[in-house]
């Protein structure tokens, strides 16, 4: 895949439930601590190395940000690092929280 794909929160949720992809959240630490998708990995400059060590490059990665804009740049970056399939989640955490309020976790 040369280009990331945009995906809506319903499709992202389904991929997560079926263990077809991993979810990363690129928001700042304070926003992440105030609420994030329960299965999200907090991807920062400091955690990128650990994420890349622990996740195979052929595992699809879904990127979540605030509203679905910043995730596009991060998705492109992950493709450039060698990940085969990367998605940017349209609507970001705001849409996720609205659609799946029971699947929001709190804390770091």
Swiss-Prot record:
The keyword Zinc-finger is assigned to this record: no
Catalytic activity, as annotated: thiosulfate + hydrogen cyanide = thiocyanate + sulfite + 2 H(+); thiosulfate + [thioredoxin]-dithiol = [thioredoxin]-disulfide + hydrogen sulfide + sulfite + 2 H(+)
Cross-referenced SUPFAM superfamilies: Rhodanese/Cell cycle control phosphatase (SSF52821)
GO biological process assignments: glycerol metabolic process
Pfam family, one: Rhodanese
Compartmental location: Cytoplasm
InterPro entries named in the record: GlpE_sulfurtransferase (IPR050229), Rhodanese-like_dom (IPR001763), Rhodanese-like_dom_sf (IPR036873), Thiosulf_sulfurTrfase (IPR023695)
Chief localisation class: cytoplasm
Residue span, Rhodanese domain: 17-105
Cellular component, GO annotation: cytoplasm
Residues the record marks as active site: 65
HAMAP family cross-referenced by the UniProt entry: Thiosulf_sulfurtr (MF_01009)
Job description of the protein: Transferase that catalyzes the transfer of sulfur from thiosulfate to thiophilic acceptors such as cyanide or dithiols. May function in a CysM-independent thiosulfate assimilation pathway by catalyzing the conversion of thiosulfate to sulfite, which can then be used for L-cysteine biosynthesis.
Protein name: Thiosulfate sulfurtransferase GlpE
Protein source organism: Escherichia coli O1:K1 / APEC
């Amino acid at each position: 895949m040369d280009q990331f794909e945009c995906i809506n929160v319903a499709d992202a949720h389904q991929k997560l439930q079926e263990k077809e992809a991993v979810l990363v959240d690129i928001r700042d630490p304070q926003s992440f601590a105030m609420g994030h998708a329960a299965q999200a990995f907090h991807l920062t400059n400091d955690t990128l190395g650990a994420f890349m060590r622990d996740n195979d490059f052929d595992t699809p990665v879904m990127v979540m940000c605030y509203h679905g804009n910043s995730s596009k740049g991060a998705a492109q970056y992950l493709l450039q690092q060698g990940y085969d399939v990367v998605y940017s989640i349209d609507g970001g955490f705001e849409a996720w929280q609205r659609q799946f309020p029971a699947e929001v976790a709190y804390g770091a």
